[in-house]
């Protein structure tokens, strides 16, 4: 008499976690295999996509046509003085803020783009 897959699954369902761990270890030893997840070799971006980014940098690539509005937006977002904000705008491409959460980075990007700047999030 052979045991069906359903019977095996039912037996697993009735086991405690420790019993399942012991069973897996015994199966690894018996069959010479490992229950570790297989690592799939992908492209260079495959690993980066798997680990989701949690910190973002807002980079201004250009201040666009409306430099005054961009300087005002930079002052409001960073707390810089007029001279420092003007220097930042003129030194584009420049990191406006670094290590932001995604929502904060998106909001800052929208604010600077509304003022006329060209902005990227990295």
Swiss-Prot record:
A Gene Ontology term for the protein's cellular component: cytosolic large ribosomal subunit
Pfam families: Ribosomal_L12, Ribosomal_L12_N
SUPFAM superfamilies: ClpS-like, Ribosomal protein L7/12, oligomerisation (N-terminal) domain
MF terms (GO), sorted A to Z: mRNA binding; structural constituent of ribosome
Any one biological process term the GO annotation gives: translation
PANTHER family linked: 39S RIBOSOMAL PROTEIN L12, LARGE RIBOSOMAL SUBUNIT PROTEIN BL12M
NCBIfam families: L12 (TIGR00855)
UniProt function note: Forms part of the ribosomal stalk which helps the ribosome interact with GTP-bound translation factors. Is thus essential for accurate translation.
Protein name (Swiss-Prot/TrEMBL): Large ribosomal subunit protein bL12
Protein source organism: Shewanella woodyi (strain ATCC 51908 / MS32)
Underlying gene: rplL
